[in-house]
């Protein structure tokens, strides 16, 4: 079963975010991560290792028909940075962190989806790999050093039901 449009967009972000947060614990895949940023902009101090999650533009998976069920694709980009004294070591550590981000999502998304949605409901169809690439370096404030950054992009393929959304709005108007 699918979920309605209103629930769908919010839940996709929440499921991906919680998939990473589940591994930020002791003995988790991401236990060494000091800063996890699940929002588009950040003005706070960042400690490394850092993972910055960006939800990108949602597009229809095939022809968009708003009269019923629609498959959508929402890419998420994760920018990862780790400091090491030697730049080559930092590069390897940053790539390793990007790999662990993908593994964290792979490990947790189905369990978290089943906890977040009503029994029998399914929203995320699958998650596919889109891109993995070095993004360059970022400057560390107050230091002459730079951190290498690696990005990994995963596409979340999910299903929403426009009609279910309309029925829910119509049914709630009398309340």
Whereabouts are the PLM-identified features?
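Oligomerization/assembly interface segments of phage tail-like spikes and tubes
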Residues: 68-87, 145-160
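Acidic-leaning, charged glycine-interspersed low-complexity segments
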Residues: 23, 47-52, 96-159
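Extracellular/virion structural assembly segments
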Residues: 69-72, 81-111
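Short, surface-exposed loop and linker segments with low hydrophobicity and enrichment for Pro/Ser/Thr
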Residues: 44-46, 59-73, 138-148
């Amino acid at each position: 079963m699918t979920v309605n449009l209103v629930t769908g967009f919010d839940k996709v972000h929440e499921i991906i975010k919680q998939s990473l947060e589940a591994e930020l614990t002791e003995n988790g895949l991401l236990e060494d991560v000091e800063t996890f940023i699940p929002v588009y902009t950040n003005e706070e101090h960042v400690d490394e290792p850092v993972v910055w999650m960006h939800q990108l533009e949602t597009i229809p998976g095939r022809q968009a028909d708003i009269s019923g069920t629609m498959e959508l694709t929402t890419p998420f980009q994760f920018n990862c940075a780790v400091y090491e004294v030697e730049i080559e070591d930092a590069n390897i550590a940053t790539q390793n962190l990007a790999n662990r981000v993908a593994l964290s999502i792979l490990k947790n998304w189905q369990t978290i989806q089943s906890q977040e949605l009503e029994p029998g409901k399914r929203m995320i169809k699958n998650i596919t790999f889109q891109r993995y690439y070095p993004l360059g370096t970022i400057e560390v404030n107050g230091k002459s050093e730079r951190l290498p950054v690696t990005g990994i992009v995963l596409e979340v393929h999910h299903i929403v039901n426009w009609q279910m959304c309309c029925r829910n709005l119509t049914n709630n108007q009398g309340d």
